[in-house]
Regions:
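Short, hydrophobic alpha-helical segments
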Residues: 84, 291-303
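Residues at the starts of beta-strands that form the adenosine-phosphate
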Residues: 122, 144-148, 266
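Short, well-ordered coil/turn residues at beta-beta hairpins
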Residues: 82, 86-88, 93-95, 126, ...
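Glycine-rich adenosine-cofactor-binding loop
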Residues: 123-134
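Beta1-alpha1 glycine-rich phosphate/pyrophosphate-binding loop at the start
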Residues: 1-39, 133-160
């Protein structure tokens, strides 16, 4: 029996979401559950795993005890022989008013997911000074009117980090006509929505025309149509780390040549939470299948 324990969805699917561009994650997950409902060996429950206890081996099998919180119920214990961690990552957004409210709707981190929809529009970069040159590399073929809002981070420390990454970073920004604004941002206000609900749903991409006003603690505001960001992220759940899974660069260590098994026998890590460094829906689907097929083959035939 396969037990899938699920939690809440992020706000939007990005442009790397197979053929489901613009589909809300809640519906995407609903459709996956509908398809899985035809298999009587799969059971899905809405619950949160808070702890994984490694019980060692019973013969040839790994054993685990899971502490699981169900809505409105006491914590339950569930046993498992194999565990697949699909816990994902979460972005660490700044507290600046307007960032979280508009995240994924004109403020984005992936130019290959959302950049084309804002091509040739006034673009803002939201990042520390030492991350700006890297963002410019990513969007240089899409936008020419670019402001870098470094939010007070233009100092000797970040300048040294920028020089370490790209010694000629100042000339590089000048070459691409990037204006660096070091003022402290007080708020990012949406002036216009770029919703494309009335666009032809058969099209793979349509322009989005958002508009924002960046306000500062001093001086005049600046208007931008979209923002490319560089914010840190973290594991959405710590259950893998608490179970002994090694973190490498903030990711769950997974061996891609062995079904994405972690350093803990019996525990696998898939999706963007693991160490193979890819963050999109097709990749998550692929890694899920790879882990499932691999661990399925680890059970003797009499248990299948």
């Amino acid at each position: 029996m396969l037990l899938a324990l699920t939690v809440s969805c992020p706000p939007t699917l990005d442009k790397t979401s197979t053929d489901n561009i613009g589909v809300q994650p809640a519906y995407y997950r609903y459709e996956a559950r509908r398809l899985l409902s035809y298999y009587d060996t799969v059971k899905m429950e809405n619950a949160t795993v808070t702890d994984i206890e490694n019980k060692g081996k019973n013969g040839n099998f790994t054993q685990f005890s899971l502490s699981v919180d169900y809505p409105g119920q006491p914590t339950k214990k569930i046993t498992a022989r194999k565990i697949v961690l699909a816990t994902g990552l979460q972005d660490i957004l700044p507290s600046t008013p307007g960032v979280a409210e508009n995240w994924g709707k004109g403020i984005f981190w992936c130019p290959w997911c959302d950049g084309h929809e804002h091509e040739d529009q006034p673009l803002g970069l939201l990042a520390p000074l030492n991350k700006i040159a890297g963002l410019v590399r990513e969007m240089a073929t899409l936008n020419r009117d670019v402001y870098a809002f470094v939010n007070g981070t233009d100092n000797s420390t970040t300048q040294a980090l920028a020089t370490k990454d790209l010694p000629q970073w100042k000339q590089y920004l000048q070459l691409h006509n990037v204006t660096v604004d070091n003022r402290t941002i007080s708020e990012i206000k949406r002036i216009k929505s770029g919703d494309t609900h009335n666009a032809d749903p058969s099209l793979p991409s349509v322009p989005e025309f958002d508009l924002f006003r960046v306000e500062f603690t001093e001086g005049k505001p600046v208007e931008r149509a979209a923002f490319l960001t560089s914010f840190p992220d973290e594991q959405r759940s710590d259950v893998g780390e608490k179970a002994g899974v090694e973190l490498v660069g903030g990711r769950l260590q997974a061996n891609a040549s062995a079904g994405l098994i972690t350093n803990v026998p019996g525990i696998y890590a898939i999706g963007d939470a693991n160490t193979d460094g890819t963050t999109n829906v097709p990749h998550a689907l692929f890694t899920g299948k790879r882990a499932a097929v691999f661990l399925h083959g680890k059970f003797p035939p009499r248990f299948l």
